[in-house]
């Protein structure tokens, strides 16, 4: 008999793989990955061709803590989206592939996407 928490985590891994099997980021069009936990939000620009993170921002970063972006809510998520768009513009990145992972495109995930779009990223 399997544990219900094991089943839940297994389903989460399957959802993430289902989304990521069609998404590939490159240096011209990196992958915008969004991960949320119970307390924090992490956003990264990833170049999958070399396996390197180009830029990242989160509610754990020192710059976010200094500007008061420490809680996990929709306002903070939108600010993180605009901040990652600004970092992407500094790297001459204007187009990205959005990777929502195993999460629904709703709430915090949607607000990160909206903030990134308002910041100038296209996807």
UniProtKB/Swiss-Prot annotation:
Claim: Ribonucleoprotein is one of the keywords in the record: yes
Record GO terms (molecular function): 5S rRNA binding; structural constituent of ribosome
Gene3D superfamilies membership: 3.30.420.100
Keywords: Ribonucleoprotein, Ribosomal protein, RNA-binding, rRNA-binding
Keyword Chloroplast part of the UniProt annotation: no
Any single biological process term in GO: translation
Role summary: This is one of the proteins that bind and probably mediate the attachment of the 5S RNA into the large ribosomal subunit, where it forms part of the central protuberance.
Annotated PANTHER family: 39S RIBOSOMAL PROTEIN L18, MITOCHONDRIAL, LARGE RIBOSOMAL SUBUNIT PROTEIN UL18M
Family membership: Belongs to the universal ribosomal protein uL18 family.
Subunit structure: Part of the 50S ribosomal subunit; part of the 5S rRNA/L5/L18/L25 subcomplex. Contacts the 5S and 23S rRNAs.
Protein name: Large ribosomal subunit protein uL18
């Amino acid at each position: 008999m399997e544990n219900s928490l094991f089943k839940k985590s297994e389903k989460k891994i399957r959802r993430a793989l289902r989304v990521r099997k069609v998404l590939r980021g490159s240096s011209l069009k990196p992958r915008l990955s969004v991960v949320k936990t119970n307390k924090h939000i992490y956003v990264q620009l990833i170049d999958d061709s070399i396996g390197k993170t180009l830029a990242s921002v989160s509610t754990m970063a020192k710059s976010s803590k200094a500007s008061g972006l420490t809680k996990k809510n929709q306002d903070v998520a939108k600010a993180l989206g605009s901040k990652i768009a600004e970092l992407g513009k500094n790297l001459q990145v204007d187009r990205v592939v959005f990777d929502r992972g195993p999460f629904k495109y709703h709430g915090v995930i949607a607000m990160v996407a909206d903030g990134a779009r308002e910041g100038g990223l296209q996807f």
